[in-house]
Amino acid sequence: MVASNNMKGLRAFISDLRSLEHDDEEKRVNVELAKIRAKFQSSTLSAYDRKKYVSKLLYIYMLGYPITFGHMEAAKLLSGTKYSEKLIGYLAVALLLNENHELMKLVINSIKKDLLSHDSLQNSLALHTIANIGGRELCETVYYDIYKLLMSASNENIVRQKSALALLHIYRKFPDLINPEWFEPIVMILGDDDLNVSLAVSNFVNLIVIREPKYQKFAYGKAVGKLKNIVFEHGYSSDYLYYSVPCPWLQVNLCRILLACERPSDNPTRATLIRVLDRILSLPNDNSNVQQVNAVNAILFEAIKLAFLVDESHSLYEKCMDRLADMIADKESNIRYLAFETTAYLISCGHSITSLKHYKELILSSLRYKDVSLRKKSLELLYMMCDEENAKLIVADLLQYLPHLDSVTQEDLISKVAIISETFATDYEWYVDVTIQLLRIAGKSADDGVWHQLVHVIVNNEEIQEYATKRLFSLLQSETIHECLVKAGGYVLGEFGHLITDYPDSQPVHQFSTIYRKLNVSSPSTRVLLLTTLIKLANLQPELNDRIAKVFQEYSTIINPEVQQRACEYLQLLKMPRDFLQLVCDEVPPFLDGNRDGVHPKSRPSSKVNLVDTYPQTIPNVSKPSTPIDVPEYDISACLPGFYRLCWKDKGILYQDSQIQIGVRSEYHNSEGAIYLYYENRQSNTLKSLSSTLIRTFSTFHLATTFQDTNLPSGVQLQQKYVMSGVNEIFEPPIIHVSYVTGVIRSIDLQLPVLLSKFMKPTIFDSYDFFNHWGQMGVEREAQLTFGLNSKDRKLDAKRLTKIVSGFHWGICQNVDSIALNIVGAGIIRFGTQNVGCLLRIEPNYEQNLIRLSIRSTNTSIANTLAKEMQEILRNSF
């Protein structure tokens, strides 16, 4: 708390409060608040008293008590003649007000007056307040004055430093206020002789080069020059040495600026930077001094990232690897965490870190650290290090560690191992073994999606059905097994139990007794599934019908309504004709890839037959299920083939039948677009009362022109036009309802091929620039999906895949990825008032017809939306 030494009342008040218990403290605070309120109402209140009482209010506020008065008195202190009054006034304004407070309008003039003052202390107080709570109105009033303070060489350096930070606040919140002509002069200040000013401006420059790429070349030269001045020319005084390390924060910021910039075209600048990085990577690190170690490592981490980007000759590769290896092996957990993070960053940028794979055991050992963040980061790094060569080894190691981990880390590990085993599986038996081991060791930490996917793979791959059924049945016979394995085993045994009846101890009677034992100790949801297993067993093994009927009879009186209902229904099924039971219990068909995430046995029918349609007799004493059936709001299924095709083509047929054909033509330019619909009568009779109604839309999508005549003669076309004036929100494709009369009223819902990607402007990067931007966006701004095609009969085709990606308005970047089959793209979407950069990486697996889609963007919501859109279109376009 800032207080003048002569405010004895304040000091006494603070001393009193510190000596009191909570209840007594609250009473004392309430007494003081009443006293202060009375004093503020006095007409003889002096400036000194106002300062003292506002200080008391601030202290009370900092203790956590609400302050509902005194704001005006605090604002009056800004007009005081003494520095101490202004100091308390600005502190009160910063703490008690926010940018939308009604009193902010009253303090704007005082702040502007102090900015124009020739007193550097008053300038500093005003700049502090702007940088902390500057709202739109305040920033509009003072932004030019702040710029003048920054650019004036006659001002004290402390004022210029604070001006840079205040201007950065304005640029972050209200970029439209900053004149683009100011950027180059601001970048120039990066080379200022005062390192504090350079440090303050460096944050601003970093944001400029990210938002305004055209200034990157200029900023690159300035940053390299300043870094060289510090490293080689000792352009600093002893005041800027932090434990013998020269201005480490500025060095870190300069490296980050260079990371954000494009690679320079002039070789001298690049050569200078490589020499500077070589010197930095050779810095000694005195392990006896923690502060020095932290400062040096902060610089090293940024220098290593930068070296990988600019050193095409790889002359610094060994030094980078040696320094990273030392930090990975460091005993200090913070250093090890940052080393893991840096290594993960390099991998995400496509760089090779082969030599660090020798430290796999060391990284694995971090999974047992007490620090949860280190455990999470080490697991993330191991996941990213996986490739076709080492996937099985890493999975085996992770499975060894799995039993010894806490539940949170187990859950994360299970998820990652499941993805690795599916992505890099060379044979499905290995995948089945790994997934079963995951569920056996840590089933309680596993998401249901893990065993759902196991069932999916088994059902869809005939060659492993016998092997998987035998493995799961063997586990079902053990006494202690987690319920997720019971569910998976029960499901698979019901479908494929007949495949293992020739094995010893796997005869139908053994299968029945095993399932019955598990029924008695399982949860209601598992019991429901196991009852389904028994009805399927009864279908294939008629000799067990009596035993199974007794089980159904037993569970038909159980208290749980869902289990009871299922038992009653299955008991009635056993009494029906044999051919009907066979029809109902037909083997489950292969799952479509589109449902791979939803293979829940309860939510999917085990037969292609509807019981009601097939056997209309009523079943006594069986109630209807209480769970409602979800009915889609719109039925757009008829237009989906055309919709999927037009999402990556500019024109074509959206829908047609024997009566009407509806075509589409799209035009997009930057952030605006138009979509034309063509209605054509395909029959000899006139279509009457043709209408088209927009039933789902978004804010900038609206009808521009439409047909006037609602009658459509044979062979005639009618046109309709919709326009899009930019995009400022995440949206779903619009849907129109089309109706017409041909003797009877006919109608159809059509989903229009308007996606977020349609507003993208294609961009081309070389390898350096792509992975530079890819790394800057980071894993946290990435949307990644792995999926297959919706039809098993379809095959991925490289040419068609590239054509579809290009049709999504991505700029295809050639010779960027080290794997030639991968597709890399870039684009920019004008979203509201911002240009949002987007990067794409597609890793197709043509043998298994799988696609791994990764999209990074400066806007995470846009990355997620683009990924979901592309997933749906790609899986339905082959």
Curated annotation (Swiss-Prot):
Which keywords has UniProt assigned to this entry? Cell membrane, Coated pit, Endocytosis, Membrane, Protein transport, Transport
**Origin species:** Schizosaccharomyces pombe (strain 972 / ATCC 24843) (Fission yeast)
Membrane topology label: Peripheral membrane protein
Its subcellular locations are: Cell membrane; Membrane, Coated pit
Tell me the domain of life.
Answer: Eukaryota
> Which Pfam families would you find in this protein's record?
Adaptin_N, Alpha_adaptin_C, Alpha_adaptinC2
* Protein name per its UniProtKB record: AP-2 complex subunit alpha
Protein role: Adaptins are components of the adaptor complexes which link clathrin to receptors in coated vesicles. Clathrin-associated protein complexes are believed to interact with the cytoplasmic tails of membrane proteins, leading to their selection and concentration. Alpha adaptin is a subunit of the plasma membrane adaptor.
Any one GO cellular component localisation term in the record: cell cortex
Check the record and name the InterPro entries matching this protein.
Answer: Adaptor_Complx_Large_Subunit, AP2_complex_asu, ARM-like, ARM-type_fold, Clathrin/coatomer_adapt-like_N, Clathrin_a-adaptin_app_sub_C, Clathrin_a/b/g-adaptin_app_Ig, Clathrin_app_Ig-like_sf
Q: Is the Membrane keyword given for this protein?
A: yes
Concerning PANTHER family, the annotation shows:
ADAPTIN, ALPHA/GAMMA/EPSILON
The entry describes its oligomerization and partners as:
Adaptor protein complex 2 (AP-2) is a heterotetramer composed of two large adaptins (alpha-type subunit apl3 and beta-type subunit apl1), a medium chain (mu-type subunit apm4) and a small adaptin (sigma-type subunit aps2).
User: What GO terms are given for molecular function?
Assistant: clathrin adaptor activity
Provide the family line: Belongs to the adaptor complexes large subunit family.
